[in-house]
Amino acid sequence: MIEAAVVECAYAGCDTIWIVCNDDISPVVRYKIGDFIQDPVYLFNGYGAAPSTTLRRIPIYWVPIHPKDRDRRDCLSWSVIHGALSSFKVASSLSAWLIPDKYYVSFPHGLFDPKPLQKLRTKIKTQNNFYVSSDNNTVENDYYTSFTFGKDEFVKYRRNIRKGTGMWSSEDLDSRGIPTKTLPIEERWSAKHFKLSDVFKELDITTSLVYEAPDFYNLADWNSYRNYLASEFCETVSRPPKEMFYYREFNYIGEKQ
């Protein structure tokens, strides 16, 4: 399913792909994904004198959840926010010209044909946000549908997830305003149980581009996954050719392998 999300990002026109995955799992998954994927627009371009010389690689980066956030607020929504923040910090440390102005989110739990997104690239990259919908359901309805967001939405989403409780109660404070009583264990770190709708809400659907995916499967549980496996759409799904997506690594620079 992670491979499907990576391919979707490539068709949507992402410049880089950031996968949020902890260190204990990322080596295994990375061995399957690799370090980059070819841009399908340039790969399948049959025009020009030498199309093979105009290939464009989309690098893939791996981001682990910070240890201070694990088992505290590391829900799926926080992974989205943490991945966007990590890409911003890395890009801004290199050059102001590399700072991303929009983020595209793709979930491994939502499957649909990503090829139509290739024709929507120019609209996806506009200032207006983009949302994938299934029967008028979006991420706001706890569907694992893809969407984009910018700087303003990032601040709002991060504020929503920070509404979760911590370890200390805010009701019992001393004279200096410092909490003196801890919350019960079952009430601590409530953000790790947040649903998508708890964070990604009040979306600007009316002023944004909405793509209604004709065959979308929301893999929220085992039964929905079984329905996908038994569907006709599953029979049409195939892995991209090796020229586009295959395990490859970047060569070392100035070092011996």
Locate each region found by the language model.
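A generic structural motif
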Residues: L43-P64, F130-T138, E212-D215, P240-Y246
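C-terminal catalytic/acceptor-binding lobe
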Residues: L203-Q257
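Conserved core of the sugar-phosphate nucleotidyltransferase
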Residues: L94-K102, G110-E212
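Short, solvent-exposed polar/charged micro-motifs at secondary-structure junctions
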Residues: D71-C75, E140-T145, Y217-N223
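Short phosphate-engaging motifs
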Residues: I25, F112, S224-Y225
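Domain-wide signal for the mature, well-folded portions of proteins, strongly enriched
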Residues: D15, I19-C21, P184-S190, F194-D198, ...
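Conserved N-terminal catalytic core of the sugar/cofactor nucleotidyltransferase
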Residues: M1-P100
